[in-house]
Amino acid sequence: MMKLIITIIPDNNCDNVSLALTERKFRVTQIASTGGFLRRGNSTLLVGVEDEQLDEALEVIKQTVDSSNSRQQGVLFVIKVDKFIHF
């Protein structure tokens, strides 16, 4: 079964996280976002993964954001995907 990782991180971390994920062959969609939790200057990354890829993707995100020494780290959600259609 697939999972959808939704990661909301400061803009200054977004390129590094996207690059680290794509280097490991994960597909990433970036959306500019603003919200009440982290305020402005955020990006939302959407990453669809198979169950067996989940831990690797989460580790890549965590290591990349932690290495940035950013004060605002971000927030992450993992959602079960019932159906995935690629066209």
Where are these regions (language model features)?
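Positively charged, small/polar-rich N-terminal and surface patches that mediate targeting and assembly
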Residues: 1-87
